[in-house]
From Swiss-Prot:
Membrane spanning stretches: 62-80
Residue ranges that the UniProt entry lists as topological domain Cytoplasmic: 1-61
Annotated stretches, region: Disordered: 1-34, 295-316
Protein name (database record): Cell division protein FtsQ
Disulfide bridges in this chain: none
Function: Essential cell division protein.
Upper lineage: Bacteria, Pseudomonadati, Pseudomonadota, Alphaproteobacteria, Sphingomonadales
Membrane topology: Single-pass type II membrane protein
Coiled-coil region(s): none
HAMAP family noted in UniProt: FtsQ_subfam
Subcellular location: Cell inner membrane
Source species of the chain: Zymomonas mobilis subsp. mobilis (strain ATCC 31821 / ZM4 / CP4)
Length: 316
């Protein structure tokens, strides 16, 4: 009896899934096996023709053609705004909106014909097609022109507004005379026989120190009208050349201003200039002035001759 009870309490016998499926009518699905990397997937039979070598070659060519067509379409899409602008400009030009006049403003020293020659390259061109920046870039190549603005005045006029550089000095270097502005920028060459009434600066880099020279001369206003030229020596100090023929050698740096003021006071009391001296040496701050007397009477130099005066040489 106990044996039978134990038999009834035991777990039911495990049935096979396949047998259970046959009894219940269910369908058993096999688990999918993962595809290995070195295996290939077979195409369906109706797509088998794609594996033909000729079709593969045609597919490659078709892909190449599509890439080229796409590239050309991109180029066309990038150019069409420019083409549209060009066609619009040409249409406006046919309606009378083309360059027929050039107006120049702000020109005082430079030759006007040079400006006209540049602007005339746009003559009869449709106004919208005029390249204003190209005209401005060509104008800025001239030494006289510091800035330029080119604009359209409808219907048919180009306006060129010029800002000229102000000449500040004549720079002598290696025997050549050049007109420069206060920043040392070369404006134009200078005819030695028609030199303008401007200060003469001599030597390498002298054109780049005009502002410092101006401050130096302002310290001795009584001497400033008497000074004809200034030589920049060794890229560190000035020699001042007086119209009466003397040369004053100044020390370097900030000591130059004090030395020039001192010389101005001594000259006011003792009249050092136009007394036959050739050179005054004040290169040593605080030391007595060393003066050299000319063996011959000093001749006052004229403006064109000072560039060739051996006392005013740029070979330093």
């Amino acid at each position: 009896m106990a044996k039978a009870a134990r038999r009834t309490k035991s777990a039911p016998a495990r049935r096979s899934p396949r047998r259970h499926a046959r009894q219940t009518g269910a369908t058993i699905r096999r688990p999918k096996r993962p595809i290995k990397s070195n295996e290939t997937i077979a195409l369906p039979k109706w797509l088998g023709f794609l594996s033909h070598p000729l079709l593969k070659q045609m597919a490659k060519r078709l892909l190449l053609i599509l890439v080229i067509v796409g590239f050309l379409a991109g180029l066309w899409a990038a150019r069409w705004p420019q083409l549209l602008a060009t066609k619009t400009g040409e249409y406006l030009g046919r309606q009378g909106f083309s360059v027929r006049h050039v107006e120049i403003v702000g020109l005082h020293h430079m030759d006007r014909q040079a400006i006209y020659d540049i602007a005339s390259t746009q003559q009869n061109l449709a106004m919208p097609l005029v390249d204003l920046n190209a005209i401005r870039d060509r104008l800025l190549r001239f030494g006289w022109i510091e800035d330029a603005r080119v604009s359209r005045r409808w219907p048919d006029t180009l306006v060129v507004d010029i800002v000229e550089r102000n000449p500040a000095a004549v720079w002598q270097y290696h025997g050549h005379l050049r007109l420069v502005d206060n920043n040392g920028i070369i404006i134009s060459d200078v005819d030695p026989h028609a030199s303008p009434d401007l200060p003469l600066v001599i030597g390498a880099g002298a054109n780049l120190h005009l502002e410092d020279l101006g401050h130096l001369l302002e310290a001795a206003p009584s001497l400033k009208p008497m000074i004809d030229a200034a030589s920049w020596i060794g890229n560190r100090r000035w020699d001042l050349h007086f119209a009466s023929g003397e040369t004053l050698s100044l020390p370097e740096g900030n000591e130059a201003e004090a030395a020039l003021v001192r010389f101005s006071h001594i000259n006011r009391e003792h009249h050092l200039l136009e007394r036959g001296y050739v050179k005054f040496d004040m290169r040593v701050p605080g030391a007595p002035i060393t003066a050299r007397i000319s063996p011959e009477p000093v001749k006052k130099a004229t403006k064109p001759a000072k560039a060739a005066d051996p006392l005013v040489s740029d070979r330093i």
